[in-house]
Curated annotation (Swiss-Prot):
PROSITE patterns: PYRIDOX_OXIDASE (PS01064). Pathway: Cofactor metabolism; pyridoxal 5'-phosphate salvage; pyridoxal 5'-phosphate from pyridoxamine 5'-phosphate: step 1/1; Cofactor metabolism; pyridoxal 5'-phosphate salvage; pyridoxal 5'-phosphate from pyridoxine 5'-phosphate: step 1/1. It comes from Methylibium petroleiphilum (strain ATCC BAA-1232 / LMG 22953 / PM1). Belongs to the pyridoxamine 5'-phosphate oxidase family. FMN binds at residues 62-67, 77-78, 83-84, 141-142, 185, 195. SUPFAM superfamilies: FMN-binding split barrel. It is an enzyme of class 1 (oxidoreductase). Gene3D superfamilies: Electron Transport, Fmn-binding Protein, Chain A. It comes from the Bacteria. This is Pyridoxine/pyridoxamine 5'-phosphate oxidase.
Amino acid sequence: MRPDIADLRKSYEQGELDEAHSAADPLQQFEQWLDQALKAKLPEPNAMTLATVGADGRPSTRVVLIKGCDARGIVWYTNYESRKGRELAAHPFAALQFHWVDLERVVRIEGRVEKVSDTESDAYYRSRPLDSRLGAWASPQSQVIASRAVLVANAAKVGAQFLLNPPRPPHWGGFRLRPDRWEFWQGRKSRLHDRLRYTQQPTGGWLRERLAP
């Protein structure tokens, strides 16, 4: 390890998170923080790390983009035959994490994952730029390929086949994580950070608790 890595430190002093000023509903708290991240013009505030676990118990992570958020859960779109798609098919639970560095904030979300409806996937697919729609056909995501030329050739082939109106591939669509646990982290001075955890109760409400940093 480079000797200077261990010496990198930062004092977190931009904000605070307390029970009196946080929402009782975690979705409302998340939407408030997401709105602030958007207004701050952070780079890709919609980016989130998705963690899944394979049938062999090996975890994996990757960055995906949130495409929807409501009382039903958090939505993103992907290739169902990718590694994450196959892992979610075998073990339909996942964790998401947003890290808004400039705001010194992290949000973690856990829950069960399901596919969104075909209607939802079709609507979002149609909203994408043409190149992105063709790319969903051209890329055999997570498979080994000989070179980038394979992707370029595939894109040209599907472009000639579908022209300006490619249908949604049957292997491509959305997932929705239905949260049963949220955690909000706000960096604080002296490493005495604020952490609030929301756990869904059998009644449908949420238990809010403070965790030690």
